[in-house]
Amino acid sequence: MKESVIRKLEGLLERNEEVMALLGDASVISDQDRFRALSKEYAQLEDVVAGFKAYQQAQADLDSAKEMLEEDDAEMREMAQEEMKAAKAKLEHLEDELQILLLPKDPDDDKNAFVEIRAGAGGDEAAIFAGDLFRMYSRYAEANRWQIEIMSCNEGEHGGFKEVIMKVSGEGVYGKLKFESGGHRVQRVPETESQGRVHTSAVTVVVLHEVPEAEAISINPADLKVDTFRSSGAGGQHVNKTDSAIRITHIPTGIVVECQDQRSQHKNRAQAMSVLAARIQAVEDEKRRSAEESTRRSLVASGDRSERVRTYNFPQGRVSEHRINLTLYRLNEVMEGDLDAILLPLMQEHQADQLAALADEQG
């Protein structure tokens, strides 16, 4: 391992010990904000510190085995050869692990996310599939103990959604779901199809990270056009009595957000503003990424949200993830929320791409 990497790991080990000592300090314990921040930092350091300690132990084992090679006893030398082989293999494995752990973290990965699902080409069938994707993400959220909240929805005439926006809250939400942005294509026989022909429909998914109030970009109220209207969603007779639904237009960007899920106009406005902030932030993030990565685009986390990323073929029970040429014949499991079968390989490919970029920079 490079000396510069070793020095970086030693610095993290030292910082880990400092944080551990601070967490036992009475003045820190009494300051809840600082205690939470340090607890989070300690948790983030845990894996890399454990990996480096294991690396140091494997290096010590290798050095010890090398000393044993000087022994006169042939049996001891043979044992030393075996121990050297095992220690070298372990060092190689740990070095790969540590390289991944040292990759720069996306600061947004721990944030909550807004998942926007919109029916595209395919009419009623596209809306029905948008509903299927909503259910798939809901099941995945449930498996990860995340919370979901519908921000707004426009139901399809024959089921599903023309559009639905959900907020997903929990640990590491955006870091996993960000890979879902893009075009999702479905191939299946619609229930209304009497000839048994396979139809192709499309749904677009956009995943945006939530912008915490402390980090929120400044939105000038003068740049907003706010309209109220009567909700068309569920809610009984109440929805016909008050203009509780909100439509906010951000004039400089043309971004429009509607929220009508809550009975209170105040709550709908607050939800609409949080979605608007996320969308404006996404535009700003994309501008920044484009400037930084004009010469190299990430294979997996492409900013092109219209790009077709996945195909769900129901007659064959097949899911094809086009970004990494992954094909799985377990469509039912995926639709029931087993998304890790796709997301983990995507994350690994993204890490490999980052490592390759890092090697290019160092080379």
From Swiss-Prot:
Gene3D superfamilies: 3.30.160.20, 3.30.70.1660, 6.10.140.1950. GO terms for molecular function: translation release factor activity, codon specific. Belongs to the prokaryotic/mitochondrial release factor family. It comes from Shewanella baltica (strain OS185). This is Peptide chain release factor 1. InterPro entries: PCRF, Pep_chain_release_fac_I, Pep_chain_release_fac_I_sf, Prokaryotic/Mito_RF, RF-1. The modification N5-methylglutamine is found at Q237. Keywords: Cytoplasm, Methylation, Protein biosynthesis. Residues 284-305 are annotated as: Disordered. The keyword Transmembrane does not apply. Pfam families: PCRF (PF03462), RF-1 (PF00472).
